[in-house]
Amino acid sequence: MTYDKIILGAGLYGLYAAQKCGAAGQRVLVLERDPAPFMRATYINQARVHMGYHYPRSYSTAIKSAHYFERFCNDYGFCLHTEFDQVYATSAHFSWTNAAEFRRFCAAAGIRCDDVAPERYFNPGLCDGAFLTTEYTYDAQILKRWFLEQLAALPNVEVLYSHKPTAIEKVGSAWRVQAGDITAEAPYLLNATYAGVNDVHAMLGLPPFGIKYEKCEIILCTVDKSLKNTGITVMDGPFFSLMPFGRTGLHSLTSVTFTPHETSYDSVATFPCQQECGGVCKPGSLYNCNECPAKPQSAWPYMSQLARKYLKEEYGFAYHSSLFSMKPILKASEIDDSRPTVVRVMNDEPKLVSVLSGKINTVYDLDEVLEV
């Protein structure tokens, strides 16, 4: 079969591209190795729609996040949870950024930052500033249903699940992709596989993105009434976040120190657990960590202890469940904690574009390369 575009990956970036190109009349094929869309990073993350507060050491990342925040809210407001207080605080110890610097950063970025008394939320002496901000959380399952409804109305878009590409080759002015029982060709290939981006590059003999891989855990928590409508993020160092997880009624707990269980610096993700998973995962072919028989033990004892050290006792929370996923991070980002979206044209004819982004609302960066 011949298409205008073949898209690898049915996360947000893949389905956004499919919907946009399909609505323009293009014939699109999406290939997803999992049995359903949004099974990995689009679902398994903090679900934070970034306004930029997270990046006081990377003004460029903050500005881009703020720029796209309003557009994302307008386009996908139906999946957002907006009715809660999002509190950012700066730790009095071991933080790269203090309260005064955070205020200056927010003023420079033009984003809301209203002082609140740290002792309202935190134990004495632990935070030198606390701020009410404007930031929301999205519900990946609601967003997924919307995209599937949109794509179902486009007969020129086909999405195939449980179809992992096994071979990709250049044939004249097209890419030929084999996946499962199908062979498809298109003059345009979009690599939107996120943590699998270098797996595709390796198949084609292309240079890898310079990334490290973190095997990450998001802990879902039930919370006391006092926390139900509040999100807490303590900056800017080895701290934590506890905030609503979309519209699920649960909160996500993450920690800079304990959310990443292991890190791989190889060009394709390589971890000891791949020797213990019964062959379902290997370097160059990442399985879904959340479904893996070799997924790690929860870091709940460490994360919860850290959060309880900071939070006043009245803000209670309890373990519900854990979600695991692989997070690729550009090695260059280790210096300033930036999270640039990389959209790179790897080949002109036939066209191959690879995208890597750790933020939901910078999906619009794809617009400049989709050719619609």
Predicted segments — roles?
Residues 3-29:
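N-terminal Rossmann-like FAD-binding beta1-loop-alpha1 element of flavoenzymes
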Residues 22-43:
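Glycine-rich FAD pyrophosphate-binding loop
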Residues 38, 182, 186-235, 245-250, ...:
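Central helical "cap/lid" subdomain
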Residues 46-129:
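Dinucleotide-binding Rossmann-like beta1-alpha1 core, especially the glycine-rich loop
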Residues 80-90, 116-154, 158, 176-177, ...:
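Helix-loop-beta segment of a Rossmann-like dinucleotide-binding subdomain
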Residues 131-188, 192-202, 363-371:
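Helical element adjacent to the flavin cofactor pocket in flavoenzyme catalytic cores
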Residues 260-327:
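Flavin-binding catalytic cores
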Residues 301-372:
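C-terminal catalytic lobe of FAD-dependent flavoproteins
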